[in-house]
């Protein structure tokens, strides 16, 4: 029997695609995009288009497995060898009994905070991302994980100005006249925004790309501006210098809807284009040209992504960029504003899903918080108490964590009990004691929000789990039973949890129920209920519609009038306005306006060259992987021919006697790796770049994170993957 199931892609991507899965005789035989989804519109990215290779892979973990060889002994073995030589198959009952026994013993001897959950964005489904797992660890009294490895610096920088993760909806990009992709490889990892940009360009829009790496998007741009890594705040301040000095800002919008303009004016005065040119590598003429075009060619919009916040001053960089649309008033325009993340709009009832009050039952207080970026130090140095059990799911820390050598040293500890819930044997399972088989999104039901559009979806289960795989929800439910947790929340069904997630005070969820989502497959958030329009805002939208005569607010693609979140201010900040000056930052001992300070590890920093590491490293994510996901699939790896390469500028290569194709050694004080030199024009002088891969596929068994640092960002305690300096030389065996 053949049937088609509506689902949604849960991977860590802004697009959250609507998906159609064809099932025949209980097996998935086809995956395709849902043509009725207003944003993703029926096509899939190259990696998810090959998702059957993932679901049906012969390398799936199908049964609970227990280690029978020393930790790390399989790090360079093949998949078949790994399964037969390192593991023995056990039943779920055996696995759960052993895990529960070990956890109870650790709690009794060291206390519950010696147990650490470790998860991130392996799925962004509301339930399998953060529900039963959080309940379990809260009830256990385990240490809390500060999940900050990816995006928190940018989010905190954004919110310090506008108060919420909200912005320009993707459909409106089609009506922009000037589009800046700032640290955003749209063509590579936000592909469903690209058609809207192409539509705008067909109508005459200009696409500008600001990025230290010549990405796919940069190659398609009308104007590409390579920038020195970590200098984005300087460029934004230079643009504001020109905009203010030449009176190109929207004085009325600034007066009515912002605070701290005079402080910003005084600060921007100190950043003339000539000084900015020295820091950024962008000429003063180009800085002036960019400022003038951005401020005058309206509607203008910035698609800024998380690349700019993965440096030591990443939070302030995002804060500076977020000020730009507030300064020129582009929030008033359809096709204007800025987009980083739209996830703050959904407002699901996370407290009902996660139940943090369970910590009080276990500890009588909230548990301590441990930062995920610093896992190496946490496993090797943390005391009071040390970590004695690590439970990994939705993540692959042995591949994605910075300071890889320290992470592996910690994972190798014989006294560390490690459980990994996974779909495949990964770098992290090489150090696990127990591996549990996990479902893909084909095999469980979930509720799916997005951070790149405003549509909420139910992702339906399409097929039975393969082998003995279990979802995060079902696995933690079973483990709670083994731990004798009698709280009723561990018996709650998936449908009930979806219902409770939708029972929110957020007015944008008004009228959105599970029944409606299952019937309609996707529902746009209810902005009419959330932001009733006064006369002034209605006039603003009407005026913007007149500037975009091809916009039909009642079209099926939009489904409602365009959403202009800050056309009339309404910023959910302490002041109720966009904050050029932040009292909150001041109370935290931080600069209340914005400034540029060079990252310590950078060409302008205070010691990288003196330490003998003059090259700035970009530890990039492959276009066709999602962080470390998909890296083990041959059909997807075939689309990434540059894995294992270090891209260099010809000037830097020549100075070191390196030619294209040579085997080289990249190193700093934290470690070294061997790669193959690729001498091309993808990076400017002084910059090198390499793509993240699994350590087991990398020469020498260590990936690019051997070189990265545990140092945290200025805001949000995030990772500084792009504040790294190295030296390169020819490899000598």
What is each PLM-predicted segment?
Residues 1-246, 270, 283, 393, ...:
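N-terminal export/assembly segments and adjacent metallocofactor-ligating motifs
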Residues 67-70, 85-89, 94, 241, ...:
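N-terminal leader/propeptide and maturation segments of large enzyme subunits in energy/redox metabolism
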Residues 73, 81-82, 535, 547-549, ...:
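Short, low-complexity intrinsically disordered segments enriched in A/P/G/S/L with frequent Arg
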Residues 130-198, 203-209, 233-237, 322-431, ...:
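Extended redox/cofactor-interaction regions of prokaryotic respiratory oxidoreductases
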Residues 220-227, 439, 454-466:
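Short beta-alpha connecting loops at secondary-structure transitions
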Residues 239, 259-375:
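Active-site phosphate/pyrophosphate-binding segments
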């Amino acid at each position: 029997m053949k049937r088609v199931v509506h689902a949604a892609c849960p991977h860590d991507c802004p697009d959250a695609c609507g998906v159609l899965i064809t099932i025949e005789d209980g097996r998935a035989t086809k995956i395709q995009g849902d043509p009725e989804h207003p944003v993703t519109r029926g096509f899939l990215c190259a990696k998810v288009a090959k998702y059957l290779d993932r679901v049906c892979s012969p390398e799936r973990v199908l049964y609970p497995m227990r280690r029978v060889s020393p930790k790390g002994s399989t790090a360079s073995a093949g998949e078949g060898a790994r399964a037969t030589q390192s593991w023995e198959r056990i039943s779920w009952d055996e696995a759960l009994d052993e895990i529960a026994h070990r956890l109870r013993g650790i709690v009794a001897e060291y206390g519950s905070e010696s147990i650490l959950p470790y998860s991130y964005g392996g799925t962004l489904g509301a339930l399998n991302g953060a529900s039963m797992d959080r309940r379990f660890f809260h009830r256990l009294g385990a240490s809390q994980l500060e999940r900050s490895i990816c995006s928190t610096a940018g989010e905190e920088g954004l919110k310090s100005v506008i108060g919420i993760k909200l912005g320009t909806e993707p459909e409106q990009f089609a009506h922009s006249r000037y589009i800046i992709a700032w640290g955003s490889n749209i063509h590579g990892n936000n592909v469903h925004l690209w058609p809207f940009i192409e539509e705008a360009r067909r109508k005459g829009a200009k696409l500008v790309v600001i990025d230290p790496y010549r990405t796919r998007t940069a190659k398609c741009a009308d104007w590409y501006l390579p920038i020195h890594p970590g200098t984005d705040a300087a460029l934004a301040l230079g643009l504001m210098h020109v905009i203010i000095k030449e009176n190109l800002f929207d004085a009325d919008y600034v007066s009515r809807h912002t605070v701290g303009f005079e402080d910003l004016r005084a600060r921007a005065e100190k950043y003339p284009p000539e000084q900015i040119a020295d820091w950024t590598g962008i000429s003063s003429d180009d800085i002036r040209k960019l400022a003038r075009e951005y401020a005058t060619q309206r509607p203008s919009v910035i698609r800024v992504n998380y690349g700019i916040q993965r440096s030591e001053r990443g939070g302030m960089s995002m804060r500076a960029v977020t000020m730009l649309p507030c300064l020129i008033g582009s929030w008033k325009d359809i096709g204007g504003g800025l987009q980083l993340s739209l996830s703050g709009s959904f407002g699901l009832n996370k407290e009902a899903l996660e139940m943090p009050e369970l910590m009080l039952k276990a500890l009588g207080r909230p548990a301590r918080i441990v930062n995920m970026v610093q896992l190496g130090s946490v496993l090797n140095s943390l005391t009071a108490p040390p970590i004695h059990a690590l439970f990994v799911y939705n993540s692959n820390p042995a591949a994605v964590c910075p300071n890889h050598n320290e992470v592996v040293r910690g994972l190798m500890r014989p006294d560390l009990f490690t459980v990994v819930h996974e779909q495949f044997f990964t770098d992290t399972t090489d150090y696990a004691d127990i591996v549990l088989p996990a479902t893909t999104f084909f095999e469980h039901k979930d509720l799916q929000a997005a951070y790149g559009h405003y549509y909420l979806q139910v992702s339906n289960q399409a097929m039975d789990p393969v082998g003995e795989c279990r979802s995060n929800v079902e696995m933690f439910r079973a483990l709670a039973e083994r731990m004798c947790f009698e709280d009723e929340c561990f018996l709650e069904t998936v449908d009930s949890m979806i219902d409770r997630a939708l029972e929110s005070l957020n007015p944008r969820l008004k009228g959105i129920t599970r029944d409606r989502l299952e019937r309609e497959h996707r529902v746009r958030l209810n902005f009419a209920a959330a932001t009733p329009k006064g006369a002034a805002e209605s006039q603003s939208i009407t005026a913007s519609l007149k500037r975009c005569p091809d916009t039909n607010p009642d079209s099926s693609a939009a489904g409602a009038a365009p959403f202009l979140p800050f056309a009339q201010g309404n910023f959910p900040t302490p002041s109720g306005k966009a904050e050029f000056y932040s009292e909150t930052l001041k109370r935290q001992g931080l600069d209340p306006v914005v400034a540029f300070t060079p990252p310590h590890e950078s060409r302008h920093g205070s010691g990288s060259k003196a330490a003998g590491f003059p090259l700035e490293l970009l530890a990039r994510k492959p276009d066709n992987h999602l962080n470390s996901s998909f890296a083990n699939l041959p059909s997807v790896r075939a689309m990434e021919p540059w894995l294992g390469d270090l891209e260099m500028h010809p000037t830097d290569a020549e100075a070191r006697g390196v030619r294209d194709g040579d085997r080289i050694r990249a190193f700093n004080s934290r470690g070294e790796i061997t790669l193959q030199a690729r001498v091309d024009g993808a990076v400017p002088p002084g910059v090198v770049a390499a793509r993240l891969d699994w350590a087991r596929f990398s020469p020498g068994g260590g990936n690019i994170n051997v070189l990265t640092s545990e140092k945290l960002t200025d805001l949000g305690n995030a990772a500084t993957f792009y504040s790294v300096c190295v030296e390169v030389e020819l490899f000598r065996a």
